């Protein structure tokens, strides 16, 4: 499985901000690391997020909800989630509007992790 490093997420965030605008500043490195490393947590020797879909959804959810960046949290969360899934062999079938809706829903608190995971599963390409 291809993992995303702190450096990769920071670079992707910079590229997104350059392309779409906003502040490139990092608010809290610990919140960023928590989002990135949290998907690999274990308890009693068992992964808390064992599937690629679970890891991807958790990564997207925590990047958005942790607010590690001054700006662009929704954009980086959804982009990293979708890219993580794709590089790990999971193709998605969703429109830009679908992605925007999911990102805004997570940010507003109307979509939790389990609901984002369901969204990922429902938008997986067949």
Question: Residue ranges of each PLM-predicted region?
Answer:
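FIC/Doc superfamily catalytic core
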Residues: 1-126
């Amino acid at each position: 499985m291809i993992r995303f490093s702190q450096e990769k997420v920071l670079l992707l965030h910079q590229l997104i901000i350059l392309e779409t605008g906003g502040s490139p500043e990092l608010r809290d490195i610990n919140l960023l690391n928590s989002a990135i490393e949290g998907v690999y947590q274990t308890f009693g020797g068992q992964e808390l997020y064992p599937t690629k879909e679970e890891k991807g959804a958790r990564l997207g959810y925590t990047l958005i909800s942790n607010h590690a960046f001054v700006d662009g949290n929704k954009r980086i969360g959804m982009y990293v989630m979708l890219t993580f899934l794709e590089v790990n062999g999971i193709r998605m079938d969703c429109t830009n509007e679908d992605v925007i809706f999911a990102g805004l829903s997570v940010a507003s608190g109307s979509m939790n992790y389990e609901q984002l995971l369901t969204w990922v599963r429902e938008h997986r390409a067949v």
